[in-house]
Amino acid sequence: MTDASDLLSLSYSHYLARAAAARPALAERIAAWAAAPVTRAALDARLDELLAQGGQPPSEDALKKALRQLRGEAFGAVAERDLAGRADVAEVTGTMTDLAEAAIQRALALLAAELEAQYGEPRGPSGERLALGVVGMGKLGGRELNVSSDIDLIFVYEDDGETAGGARAPISVHEFFTRLGRRLIGVLSEATADGYVFRVDMRLRPNGDSGPLVCSLGMLEEYFYVQGREWERYAWIKGRLVTERASAAARRLAQQLDAIVKPFVYRRYLDFGVIGAIRSLHEQIRQEARRRATMRPDKADDIKLGRGGIREIEFSAQVFQLIRGGQDAGFRVQPTLAVLRHASASGLITEEVRAGLTHAYLFLRTLEHRLQYRNDAQTHAMPVDPAERAALAASLGFADYAALIDRLDQHRAFVEAQFDQVFADKADGGARREDDQAAGCIWSGALADDGADEALVARLAELGFADPAAVLARLQAVWRSSRYAGLPESSRVRFDRVAHRALEAAPGIDAAHRDETVVRCFDLLETVGRRGAYLALLTEYPAALRRVLSVLGATRWGGGYLIRHPQLLDELLDDEAIDSPFDWPAFKDALRRRLAAADGAEHQMDLLRHAHQAEVFRILLLDLAGRLSVEHVSDRLSELADAMLDVTIEVVWSQLAKRHRDTPCFAAIAYGKLGGKELGYASDLDLIFLYDDPDERAADVYTTFARRLITWLTTATGAGTLFDIDLRLRPNGEAGLLVTDLDAFRRYQLREGDAANTAWVWEHQALTRARYSAGDARIGAAFEAIRVQVLTTPRDAAVLAKEIVEMREKVLAGHPNTTERFDLKHDRGGMVDIEFAVQYWVLLHAARHPEMIRNTGNIALLREVSRFGLMSEEEAETVGAAYRTYRKLQHRLRLDGMEKARVEPERVAAERQAVAALWARVFGA
C-alpha cells in the first residue's frame, strides 16, 4: 500500500491537498483505496459505513455528509491510481460513473422512504407501485464520467396517479416525484462545508428549464413526437436509466422507456439528414467556444470544444449511431470507443482510423483528467501559467510543455481531418460554369410558367438533351406535383440542390442515355422526396449522385431497382464494402445477429429484404463495372439466395409454435436456374421442400412450417418482397403435397410406387439441374444420393429421345413468339435446345459415365460430353460459345428492362445454325 506521505495525488492536486489538510484521515483513506481498482461493491460498503456514523435511519444532512466524504475519497483514489499509471481511462471514468450511480440510488431510496412515510407510496391508475426513473445523459449515460463533471439528468415516471396517503393526505404522483427530484438534486449538488457530490444539470429534459422537473412517459412520448429536435436525438443516444432495476416498477419503467426512446433516436431507415444537423450543432458549439475565448483568453485552448477535441470524436462516432442505429443494433451502445469499434467491424471506417481516433480520445480524456485533478474544476482549457504548464506536462511524462503540445497537436490534427471528412459541407463552391447556370435557370420557378417553355427547351438543348421537350415535360410534372409542393422547406432546399446537380451533370452523361438517365433521376427524387435522409445523402455526398446517374444510365432494371429500394443509396458510399470478397458464412452470421436484435417479425422480414437487396445491388455495381462475368454474376446471386433461404428457414422455425425440435429436419432443394447456379437478377426460385423426421406430427408440422416459410419469402412488406417462389416441380406438381417426405420422394423418383404416382421423364430432366440449397445438410446429402441413383438408371435411347422431343414441342407451344425477333431462350436454335440436348445425354449415358451428373452448368457439361466422344471438341466449343453468347445477350436485355429476351435474328445467325445442327444430329429433327 502506498504510504500516505508519498501520495502523488496530494502533491499534484491543490484540491486534494486542501481537503487532506481539513480532514487528516483522508490521506490514509486515499492510500488504502488506491491499492486496487475501486469497485461498485467497495463504494457501497464504504457508504454503508459512513451512513452508519449518522444514526439510523440517517437524516438528510447525514446523507449529504456521507456522500460528500465518499466522493472525496473516490476522487482521491482514482487520481492517485491515474497519476501513478495504475489506472487507465476506462477505470477512472468507470469509477466516477459507479460513484454517481451509487449516490443517486442510495439517495433516492432514503429520500423516497421519507416521502412515502408522509404521503404513502406512489401508485398508478391500477394501483400498481410506481418508481421514479433517473436517466443519466451525456457522459454519465455512456459510463464515461470525468472526474469533475456535471451530471445531466432527466426524471421520468411511468404514469400519472396518486399516492396512497400516510401521515399526510395523498398527493398526485407528479407532485410526489417532483418533490423527490428536488430533494435528490439538493442532496447531490448543494455546496456544504463538505463540498458537493455532483453538480446537477436538468436542462436536457423536455422543454428545458421551462419544462416540468419530472415528466410521465406519456408526456415524454408526445414531446418526442411533436417537438423532438435533432440535437435531442443526439443527446438521447447516451440516455440510460441509472436507478435500480430490480423492482417490478423499475423493470416496467425501463421497458416502456426503451420502447419510446429507441424509435425516436434510431430511425428504421438510414438517416443521413443528421450530418447537416450535427454540423449545425457543432458550429453553434464552436461559436459559443469562440465567444467565451474572446471574453476569457486564458480559456481559449479548449481540448473538449476546440478543433480536434473530444467533442469532435464523439460526433464522429455518434453520427454512425444516428444514421445506422435503426438498422444495426450493434450501434445502440453508449460508450464512444464501443461505437468506433463497431464502425470499424462494419467496414465503415478503417482499422487505422479507429485506432487513431481511439488513441486521440484516450489521450484527450487523460489530459482532461489531469486538468481537473488540479483544482477539482470542470475545466478543459490548457493552462497559460508557466508553472501550471510545467506541472501538467510532468504529470503526463513529458519533458516539457512544448513536447506535450506537440503530441496534442498531432492528435488534434488527426481528429480534425477525420471530422471534416464526415462533416465538411461538400456543396460545390467556386465559380459556376455555363452549364451550371443553365441548370439553375431550368430548375426554377420558370417551370410553372407555360410562357417560358421555348426558352427552357433551348436551355435543355444546350445541355445536350436529344428530346428537350420531353425532358421539360417531365421536369414540369415534378415541379408542379403535390409531392414536391408538399415538401418541408429543408427537404425542398435539398431537393433543389440535387436537381441542379443532376442537370449540371447532363453534358457528361453518355449521349445515347442522357435523356432517360436524367428523367429516371427525377423519378428517384420524387420517390425519396419525403424521406429527407436520402435527399441529405445525395446532398452531402456528390460522389453518390454521380454513381446514381451512372447506374441509372447503365441499366433500366438497375435504375428501377434503386427507385423501388432507395435505401440502397447508402451502398454507393462504401467502396470498401463493394470491393470486399463475398463471405457468405460471415454474411449469415451478421444477418443472424441483426435478426436477433429486431423488434418483432415484421422488422425481421424487412431486415431480410434489406440485406438481400444490398447484396444484389453490390453484385450489380460490380457487374456494371465489368468486374464480374455473366457466369460469376449468376454464381453470386445463387449463393446469396442459398444464404437467404438458410437464414430464413432458421428464423421462421424459431417462431413456429408447433415446432417439436430445436432444428428442423427440413431442406430446400433448388431446381431450374437456382439449381444450375444460373440465377438472374429477377429470377424466380424453383424449389421443392423435403423432410425426414420420424415424429408422428412431422407431416403436419412441416406443412405448417412450409406455408409460413413461403409467406416470409414472398409477402410484400414495406421493404418489398424477398423472392418469387415456384413450387410446381414438387412431386405431382400443383396437385402434390407442399412438403414431401424424403422416402416418398425417393420412391416417386425411382418409380417404385403405383404408376399414377411416379416421376415423368421431364421431372428427371429437371433433376439434372437440381441441388441442395438450404436447411438440413443431412437431407441434402440424402437427396444427392437419390439424384445419383435416378440419373444413373439405364434408359432406352429411342424412348428417351421421343419423350424429350415431345416435351420440347410443349415448351415451344407454351411460349409462342409472334414477332420477327428471335427469342434467345425458347425459339428453335436457342438456349432450351442446348439444355434439352445436354439433359438427354446425361439421362442416356450417366449409367456408364457417372461424371456427367455433376451439376456444373451446361457449358462444362458440353465439354464432358465431348470428352466421352458423344460430340466433337469443335462442336462442344461452338455450341458452348453459342450458349455463352445467348446468356450474355439475355443478361444485357434483362438489365435494359426487357421482359422478353429477343433480338434481331441476324445478330445470332451463326449461333442458331450451330444449335440447330446439334439438335438435328442428336434427335434427327
From Swiss-Prot:
Belongs to the GlnE family. It is an enzyme of class 2 (transferase). Signal peptide: none annotated. Its EC number is 2.7.7.89, 2.7.7.42. GO terms for biological process: regulation of glutamine family amino acid metabolic process. InterPro entries: GlnE, GlnE_rpt_dom, NT_sf, PII_UdlTrfase/GS_AdlTrfase. It comes from Burkholderia mallei (strain ATCC 23344). This is Bifunctional glutamine synthetase adenylyltransferase/adenylyl-removing enzyme. Residues 1-426 are annotated as: Adenylyl removase. Keywords: ATP-binding, Magnesium, Multifunctional enzyme, Nucleotide-binding, Nucleotidyltransferase, Transferase. Residues 436-925 are annotated as: Adenylyl transferase. HAMAP family: GlnE. The keyword Transferase applies. Its cofactor is Mg(2+). It catalyses: [glutamine synthetase]-O(4)-(5'-adenylyl)-L-tyrosine + phosphate = [glutamine synthetase]-L-tyrosine + ADP; [glutamine synthetase]-L-tyrosine + ATP = [glutamine synthetase]-O(4)-(5'-adenylyl)-L-tyrosine + diphosphate. Involved in the regulation of glutamine synthetase GlnA, a key enzyme in the process to assimilate ammonia. When cellular nitrogen levels are high, the C-terminal adenylyl transferase (AT) inactivates GlnA by covalent transfer of an adenylyl group from ATP to specific tyrosine residue of GlnA, thus reducing its activity. Conversely, when nitrogen levels are low, the N-terminal adenylyl removase (AR) activates GlnA by removing the adenylyl group by phosphorolysis, increasing its activity. GO terms for molecular function: [glutamate-ammonia-ligase] adenylyltransferase activity; [glutamine synthetase]-adenylyl-L-tyrosine phosphorylase activity; ATP binding; magnesium ion binding. One of its GO terms (cellular component) is cytosol. It comes from the Bacteria.
